[in-house]
Amino acid sequence: MHWIWLVLLLAVVGAIVGAATNALAIRMLFRPHRAYSIGKWQLPFTPGLLPRRQKELAVQLGNIVANHLLTAEGLGKKFGSTAFAAELTNWLKKQLASWLRSERTVESILKPLFQADIGREHLVVQSKSWLKDRLKRYLQKNKEVPIKSVVPQELQDRLTDWLPEASALLLKRATAYIDSEEGEQRIGAMVRQFLTTKGKVGSMVSMFFSADKLTEYVLPEIKKFLHDEQTKETVQSLLQTEWHRMLNRPLASFQAENYVDQFVDKAAEELEGKIPVLNWYNAPLSTWTTPYAEPLVERGVPVIVGMVTVYMEQHIADILSKLRLEEVIEEQVASFSMAHLEKLIMNITRRELHMITLLGGLIGGIVGLIQAVIVHFFY
């Protein structure tokens, strides 16, 4: 009977010692978090293993993740897999379809992103201000530049080719005016003014011809002059001369900067209600995206996903090298408090560490039994 109690006692003591030893060893992996000293003598095993080697642990974890887990080859295969592309496509389709059906306006979406007033009126004012400033800067910078350097060559050629037509149109309009009642009255008034302002010469002419009679003689001659081919050539030559002279004038000679504000304000007034983007700006997305929703979702998303996955597959190595994952992980792990790092490791390995403690107790119990047998038979 005494022998049985001895066996049980030694087995229990061995189990307790074995379990306690393993539990203490596990505890010493994490604790203490800092070094303790008596005077100048630092106590051994302080700090614990992981606190002492936290920096080295961070470096090794970074290398393991970057070189063996998140590798370019592995991620490239993932991006290149059909299953991943299909999953990403379906997810993006759902997200885009939901977004296009949204009752939110473009303004409400953009405002939080830019953290500024981007209402329609504000955008119009800012656009006008920006355009005025740009035009004035351009005119100031190029004030000595001839017009021909500013006007596109194609437009210059078209206007030059149009000059014969313009001269013909000018003469045609002049002829039509002369043939009109207003034109005849105007010519008659000019004749009367001539007679009254030329003193003796006018009085002498008036003795032979009345103003109306003289007008009847002058009108056919004017019409004949307007229909003459030489007149057409002269007008065309004058227009071409003035056109080329204008092309060589400096931009500043037109004083265009004085009309910039008026021009921009008028253009903005005319265009504001005709630009679809501005009309869509304060309208819910669903009211104007409906015609485009199906093509975007069904055809646009697969194309975009295909382009993105191919690009990522081809350039993932460069992207990872720029990210420097090992440095990111190293810095992150090194910045953890030891308590947080201990919690992370314990959450992952708690069951296994508990089994190690129990294994220590089991081995200690077996050693205790062996000791009991040795004591009983040899002592």
Curated annotation (Swiss-Prot):
This is UPF0754 membrane protein ABC1518. It comes from the Bacteria. It is a multi-pass membrane protein. The lineage of its organism: Bacteria, Bacillati, Bacillota, Bacilli, Bacillales. Keywords: Cell membrane, Membrane, Transmembrane, Transmembrane helix. Belongs to the UPF0754 family. One of its GO terms (cellular component) is plasma membrane. The keyword Transmembrane applies. It is found in: Cell membrane. Coiled coil: none annotated. The keyword Transmembrane applies. Its main location: membrane. InterPro entries: DUF445, UCP032178. The chain crosses the membrane at residues 1-21, 358-378.
